[in-house]
């Protein structure tokens, strides 16, 4: 009598490279985002005067502006308390993301997304601590309408947030 082994009796094989990733890998990626963000901010701060704008294309300028608030200058004129509020919020969010990275190491897209958010949050926290505001320098526009200036950290946060939505939609679709 031939021995048959049912599929359920065999140990599950893991052929998933994502399982081998570690939180340190994702944190290193976040650190790369921070380094790129801070590098470009330092270059802009050293070569531009406040408010200076240099055209790059017909829809993009490099500028040097400061944001004491959050996205779209939310609470920028709130009197100063917002610097420490957003600094504290960035630190809390960063700590939460590190915890998430330890809990979900096998979820590559999720970890990639939150690593981008972590790097962006840390980049902007550094600005708030060092300068008292966030340094923004990317200015996209169409005719006379200018999108609020932003930076590499903001790009990372935005792309990370979009990827989190994509990851969640993929997860919901599977179930």
UniProtKB/Swiss-Prot annotation:
Functional description taken from the UniProt entry: This protein specifically catalyzes the removal of signal peptides from prolipoproteins.
The keyword Protease belongs to this UniProt entry's keyword annotation: yes
Keywords linked to the UniProt accession: Aspartyl protease, Cell inner membrane, Cell membrane, Hydrolase, Membrane, Protease, Transmembrane, Transmembrane helix
This protein's name: Lipoprotein signal peptidase
Topology term for the membrane: Multi-pass membrane protein
Biological processes, Gene Ontology terms: proteolysis
Membrane-crossing residue ranges in chain numbering: 25-45, 56-76, 81-101, 110-130, 146-166
Active site: 136, 154
Pfam family, one: Peptidase_A8
Enzyme's top EC category: hydrolase
Family the UniProt entry places it in: Belongs to the peptidase A8 family.
Catalytic reaction(s) noted: Release of signal peptides from bacterial membrane prolipoproteins. Hydrolyzes -Xaa-Yaa-Zaa-|-(S,diacylglyceryl)Cys-, in which Xaa is hydrophobic (preferably Leu), and Yaa (Ala or Ser) and Zaa (Gly or Ala) have small, neutral side chains
GO cellular component: plasma membrane
Gene this chain is encoded by: lspA
This protein's record includes keyword Hydrolase: yes
This protein's pathway: Protein modification; lipoprotein biosynthesis (signal peptide cleavage)
Compartmental location: Cell inner membrane
EC number of this enzyme: 3.4.23.36
Superkingdom of the organism of origin: Bacteria
């Amino acid at each position: 009598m031939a021995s048959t082994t049912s599929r359920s009796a065999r140990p599950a094989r893991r052929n998933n490279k994502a399982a081998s990733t570690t939180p340190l890998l994702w944190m290193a990626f976040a650190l790369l985002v921070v380094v790129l963000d801070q590098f470009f901010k330092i270059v802009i701060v050293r070569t531009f005067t406040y408010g200076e704008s240099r055209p790059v294309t017909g829809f993009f300028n490099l500028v040097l502006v400061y944001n004491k608030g959050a996205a779209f200058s939310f609470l920028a004129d709130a009197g100063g308390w917002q610097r420490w509020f957003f600094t504290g919020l960035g630190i809390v969010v960063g700590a939460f993301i590190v915890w998430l990275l330890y809990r979900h190491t096998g979820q590559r897209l999720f970890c990639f997304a939150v690593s981008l958010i972590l790097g962006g949050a840390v980049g902007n926290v550094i600005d708030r601590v060092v300068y008292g505001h966030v340094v923004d320098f990317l200015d996209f526009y169409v005719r006379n309408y200018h999108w609020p200036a932003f930076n590499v950290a903001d790009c990372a946060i935005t792309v990370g947030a979009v990827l989190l939505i994509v990851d969640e939609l993929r997860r919901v679709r599977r179930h």
